[in-house]
Amino acid sequence: MENVIKNNDLQNVKFDINSEFFVIDANNLEKVSSKLYGFCLDNSHIVLDIKDLHKDFGNEGAYVYVKNDDNIITVKQDFVGCYGIYIFRQDDYFAISNSFMYLVDYLKKNYKLTFNKDYANAFLSSNLETFSCQETIINEIVVLERNAIIKINKAKRSMEIIHKNYQENSLEPDSKEFFASLDMWYFKWTKFIRNLKKKTNNVMVDLTGGFDSRITFLLFLGANINLDEIFINSINDNLYTHKKDYEIASKIANHYNFKLNQCNKFITSKSYYKKQDCINIFAYLKMPFHKQMYVNVEKNNSPMYSFNGFGGEAIRSYWNYGINGLIKKESNLCYSMKKYPKILKSIKKIIKRASRSIRNSYFNFDDDYFDICYFRETSNRTHFGKATLEWFYLNNFCLSPIFDSNLHKLKLSDRNCKDKNLLIAIIFTRYIKDIIKFEFNDGKYIDPKTIKYAQYLNNKYPFIDNQNKEMVSKSNNINDVSETMKEENTDIEQKNNEVMDYFNSVFLSEKTKNIFTSLYDDDLYNSIVLDSTKRYFHPLMYAFPVLGINKFKQDCNLKTNNVNNMTYFDFLKTQEGNLVDINKIKKKYEKVDRKNKLLTILGMKFIIKNKGATKTLVAVERERERESNLSPR
């Protein structure tokens, strides 16, 4: 076992921006290196080096693949599109990157960039992540669809974009092809879990009272491994639905005879990022697309493998809005439209343009799946996809079998059962039949008629498991390091707090306020300041967009002959200065509130003017917070 690092002997590790992100410049194609950025699941193994990939490697993982052959450069990405591929074009020139901020920093030296105010408005108003599909905060840069593949002809300096047909939602439930694809998914992941367990016990799987984590967990039951040798994660506190989640998970654990939350199974020591590394990882992956920061200072020296139910909303009944419903949903988070009518207009523009983009990029587009497609192209890749990469840089491989492209070929319902929970009902009643007997949290359930029809289809197309799977057990000589880890926790918590405190100090600087209020106004900035003082969960989630908007607005205003090479952390240092007076802001707005005249700005939850509306807002906010309440270990 590796030595656990003591408080007084912390080992630092550096994040190298230039090796983790790239720019392919049309004028320097010969300098492009072949590389796999991120990780790929190939032939039931995790691959990090492009040399280890098979010719027809899989779509699963979180990666951008760059291959420089004799005359062709190929760029493609995973099924979810976790990084995003960002493209700038001007006449015959093009530049491509796997990081939006990295590309902007590269281009601003030589090209005039313009600010997309519609995007900035809509992102400020959004609940958690952008609901744009291809647009970005820079008008000249777009993010490619996740099924896009780039072919660059080096001799001609030309670029072709090809769209791969993933055949999403194409297979009818009442068909052999449907069940062949579903069983392929099941065998693939149970094999992967068994192979992984033979190598390591550094495995964590979530188990809650929800649909999505249970779909992933049943694969662990089907894999026939020793569950008491891994960490089965079920949070037991009073937040959100955690109490009920833990109660349900405990019943499942008792039924299948395993224990929850045995965190002392892990064998790994830690290295530590400095403050600037954490800030740069977050910024180059997620700004300006997402409002929460999950990366922290701890990096595992030995890899960890965390399984979850990310992306489950795409395989069940969840999103049922339509275009007008989406506009209404996002507008409901921005109540002060009399004061900010331009924000409402921007929301409408972004959603309508995104919906057109989705319809044009899908093969055989089906209106019945519009919401699912919108989720895949926006929230799924931005929220879950980018979180997967944040944790990857902590040496934590975040794995969701629900991301598998084979699963997304399947239709969610059919003419005999229009309930879009049919697919998950088939999964729950096909492989581990007892698993559906346990209740779900938060009032969730699957219609008994849907379950009955799922059982009918499973009988019509029976599951045949001819694999003789002996129990996989790997007993490590594991010491209980919990006391040592407790010694570390105080120092690590302090270091993580230093990162957030620094972000907060820059957000509260007079310079930040002056730049932001030149675009908006004092009321909006002050509302975000107040929200950051009252929000318990991710208190800076509305402050991060302010810092991102300011950065990219300044990038657009720069003279190209006066640009220094700076990282995002370097940029933040230029924004430091005197702080705004929070107490003065509080007094001003508390006084207005007593007169019941406080405007509700961006739906900040500390405002109580309209109780009914506030309750609706908090419910939406808390549901999304539950989705992202996973901590890398």
Tell me what each language-model feature is.
Residues 2, 7, 46-51, 329-338, ...:
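An N-terminal alpha-helical hairpin/helix-loop-helix interaction module that forms a charged
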Residues 50-52, 60-62, 134-137, 288-299, ...:
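Short alpha-helical segments and helix-capping/turn motifs at coil-helix boundaries
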Residues 154-155, 163-368, 385-438, 450-463, ...:
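ATP-dependent adenylate-handling active sites, centered on carboxylate activation for C-N bond formation
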Residues 374-388:
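Core structural elements
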Residues 567-633:
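Boundary detector for helix-to-coil junctions that initiate low-complexity/charged tails
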